[in-house]
């Protein structure tokens, strides 16, 4: 997407053909910083400490991590060790495991001498595939926005609520939940996006609001608990969120707080859609609440908040009493029964085993 006069991806291969650059998202929206990842340790740190985040982008970053590893040691033992090291960084996002499996399955049959070049080629293919998947998701989600817009008065916006950041910053480009929004704007459909702040890391306030501003999308930042109120008063036409893991029966694991938005949407008759590329579907899991591991992140993310101080510096301040413990589950699971549809690159599926297999018959 464009930032100022430049088109950015969130991750790209450097001219040396070996290191990769990323947008370090910890500093947004106040500072756009680019960081170079040169080692597997760099990649693991970037994923674990959320320099990059969002299930698709985590997967792409891990794929490049495997490629970097192959330049140092292309052996089977090292390939397996790197798979384990990177897989442990963020356990909930299924794209991470998918990308690592894709890399290992591609490289294992190859002679060691050719693995490094092949690894970079495959990682780049995964990155390019992500862009195409998101573009297709956008086209399919745009149909939903068009349908709502057709019922509006001329110039009246489609009001969309989104949670966390499932934008281009969570992918290589376009985003999942935001791709239909960007395409609607490009088509001239009036929209207004309500952006949940998304505590505790404020990815809505820091990232989604920044994306909307950069792209010129009308939006309003709201506190996490305001969504239900807006729905009660008829101010939301549509909810679109992303997902870090979707089960074979249509349950969705997404940023903590998504479940509450789905409950409010169901109670108020607001359509609730989830946008996802197919690598986010875990076909081995059939009960999201019971089977998906939920990442527990450090309590300091709840107790402290980062922002720009009055002197212009970026500062972290404590907002809770010293000694008060904080729990920080990073995700929750929204049952399929609360979801209107799953927007994929192949179309919109009903959130059920039958609905998903209708779009992905190879999984029957």
From Swiss-Prot:
Function: Catalyzes the interconversion of methylthioribose-1-phosphate (MTR-1-P) into methylthioribulose-1-phosphate (MTRu-1-P).
Family classification: Belongs to the eIF-2B alpha/beta/delta subunits family. MtnA subfamily.
One MF annotation (Gene Ontology) recorded for this entry: S-methyl-5-thioribose-1-phosphate isomerase activity
Lineage, opening ranks: Bacteria, Pseudomonadati, Pseudomonadota, Alphaproteobacteria, Hyphomicrobiales
Active site (record annotation): 244 (proton donor)
Entry EC no(s): 5.3.1.23
Leading EC class: isomerase
Binding site for substrate: 53-55, 90, 203, 254-255
Site (Transition state stabilizer): 164
Pfam families in UniProt: IF-2B
Gene: mtnA
Keywords: Amino-acid biosynthesis, Isomerase, Methionine biosynthesis, Plasmid
UniProt-recorded name of the protein: Methylthioribose-1-phosphate isomerase
Pathway: Amino-acid biosynthesis; L-methionine biosynthesis via salvage pathway; L-methionine from S-methyl-5-thio-alpha-D-ribose 1-phosphate: step 1/6
GO terms of biological process kind: L-methionine salvage from methylthioadenosine
Keyword check for NADP: no
Catalytic activity: 5-(methylsulfanyl)-alpha-D-ribose 1-phosphate = 5-(methylsulfanyl)-D-ribulose 1-phosphate
């Amino acid at each position: 997407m464009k930032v100022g006069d430049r088109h950015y991806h969130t991750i790209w291969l450097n001219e040396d053909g070996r290191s990769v650059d990323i947008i370090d998202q910890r500093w947004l929206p106040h500072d756009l910083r680019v960081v170079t990842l040169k080692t597997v340790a760099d990649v693991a740190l970037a994923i674990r400490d959320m320099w990059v985040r969002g299930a698709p982008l985590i997967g792409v970053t891990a794929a490049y991590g495997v490629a970097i590893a192959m330049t140092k040691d292309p052996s089977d033992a090292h390939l397996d060790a790197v798979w384990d090291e990177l897989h442990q960084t963020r356990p909930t996002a299924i794209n991470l495991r998918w990308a690592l499996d894709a890399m290992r399955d591609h490289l294992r049959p190859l002679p060691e001498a050719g693995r490094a070049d092949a690894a970079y080629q495959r990682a780049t293919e995964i990155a390019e595939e992500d862009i195409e998947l998101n573009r297709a998701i956008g086209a399919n989600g745009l149909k939903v926005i068009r349908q709502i817009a057709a019922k509006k008065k001329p110039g009246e916006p489609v009001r969309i609520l989104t949670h966390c950041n499932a934008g281009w910053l969570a992918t290589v480009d376009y985003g999942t939940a935001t791709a239909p929004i960007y395409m609607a704007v490009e088509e001239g459909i009036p929209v207004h996006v309500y952006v949940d702040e998304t505590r505790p890391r404020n990815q809505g306030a820091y990232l989604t609001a920044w994306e909307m501003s950069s792209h010129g999308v009308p939006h309003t930042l709201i506190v996490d608990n305001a969504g239900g109120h807006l729905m009660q008063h008829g101010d939301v036409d549509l909810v679109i969120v992303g997902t870090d893991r979707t089960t074979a029966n249509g349950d969705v694991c997404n940023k903590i707080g998504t479940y509450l938005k789905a409950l409010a949407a169901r109670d108020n008759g607001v359509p609730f859609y989830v946008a996802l590329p197919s690598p986010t579907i875990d076909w081995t899991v059939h009960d999201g609440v019971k089977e998906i591991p939920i990442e527990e992140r450090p309590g300091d993310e709840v107790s402290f908040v980062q922002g720009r101080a009055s002197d212009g510096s970026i500062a972290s301040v404590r907002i809770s009493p010293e000694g008060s413990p904080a729990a920080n589950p990073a995700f929750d699971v929204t049952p399929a029964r609360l979801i209107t549809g799953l927007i994929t690159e192949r179309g919109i599926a009903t959130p059920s085993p039958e609905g998903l297999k209708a779009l992905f018959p190879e999984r029957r």
